[in-house]
Structures are given as C-alpha cells and as structure tokens.
C-alpha cells in the first residue's frame, strides 16, 4: 500500500511540474493516473478539483466540468468543486451561439453562488468565498437583457433548459441582466 501512495505522490509531482511548464496535456495525464491510483476519497476529491482547474487552464471546459462533477459526487459540500464547475460552464459560453451562450451564464451564476455559500462556511477556504461572489456578479453581466428575453419569447421566472456545452440538460430560471 505504501508503494501505491508513493506512486500517487510521484504522479502528483509530475503533474505539478508539467503544469508549471504549461504542458497541460501531460499534467492532466498524470493527474488522471494519480486519481485512478488514489484510494482515499478525500484525496481523490482534491485531485479531481485540481484536474478540473488544470483542464480549465488548458481551455477544456467540458473535461473540467466532468472532473468537477466527479468531485461533487464524492462530496456535495465541496465548494471548490462548485467553483471549478461554474468556471467550466462560463468558459463554455463562447462555444454556444446567441441566446444559448448567454443562458449558460444563468447556470454559471447559480453554481458560483452555491460555491460562495459553501466556501463561506469552510474555514480552510480563505478568500475564495469573496472571489466566488465576485465571479458570480461578473457572470450576471453575461445574462441576456430583458429585450433579448422578450424577443426570444422568454418570460422572467420561467424554466429554461440549457441545450449547449457541459451544462446541457440543466434546468435553470430565466432572468434578465
């Protein structure tokens, strides 16, 4: 078992080194290997959040969302998993056209607000709760305007299902900017 722990640690260190050099492909490969070898759920959860953030840096929002959701599944109270997930949703908005790209910000906002709430109750989170609140406020600026909602026949308060990107299938609430 100690050999396994050494292997996990070695992979983490290799991932860190490649990440520092900007080689995100190799970094994520080693992080995935470390996750596969990790037996401790708490450590696996931390590695998944790290993988999500590395995938974001590599401009892979879908892979980032998958890793963040896996971390969330291990611990639904992990504010950092929500923090990474919200960023993944927001990063994917540019790949969705028109109103759909703006609608993703509803989900990013909701997810980042959840992150802020969870991080505010986490003594180890430092300033991340405020960073999450600031990011949520920024995502609000991406919401469609009242006019855009009107022309797309969307009523404020109505339910809306995202149809693009890693947030596809998530139901949210229509809100103008």
Predicted regions located by residue number:
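Single conserved hydrophobic/aromatic residue that forms the stacking wall/gate
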Residues: 1-9
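TPR alpha-solenoid repeat register
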Residues: 10, 44-47, 81, 125
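Structural register within alpha-helical repeat arrays
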Residues: 14, 50-51, 85, 92
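Short coil/turn linking the two alpha-helices of tandem helical-hairpin repeats
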Residues: 42, 56-59, 86, 91-100, ...
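Terminal, low-structured helical/coil segments at or just beyond the last alpha-helical repeat
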Residues: 114-177
């Amino acid at each position: 078992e100690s050999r396994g722990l050494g292997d996990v640690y070695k992979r983490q260190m290799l991932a860190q080194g490649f990440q520092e050099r900007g080689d995100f492909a190799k970094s994520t490969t080693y992080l995935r290997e470390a996750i596969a070898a990790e037996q401790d759920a708490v450590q696996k959860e931390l590695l998944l959040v790290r993988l999500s953030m590395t995938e974001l840096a590599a401009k892979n929002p879908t892979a980032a969302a998958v890793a963040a959701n896996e971390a969330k599944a291990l611990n639904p109270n992990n504010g950092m998993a929500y923090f990474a997930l919200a960023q993944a949703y927001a990063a994917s908005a540019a790949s969705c056209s028109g109103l759909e790209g703006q609608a993703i910000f509803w989900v990013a906002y909701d997810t980042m607000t959840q992150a802020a709430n969870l991080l505010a109750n986490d003594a180890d989170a430092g300033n991340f709760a405020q960073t999450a609140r600031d990011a949520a406020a920024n995502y609000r600026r991406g919401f469609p305007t009242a006019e855009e909602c009107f022309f797309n026949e969307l009523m404020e308060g109505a339910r809306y299902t995202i149809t693009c990107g890693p947030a596809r299938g998530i139901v949210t609430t229509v809100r103008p900017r």
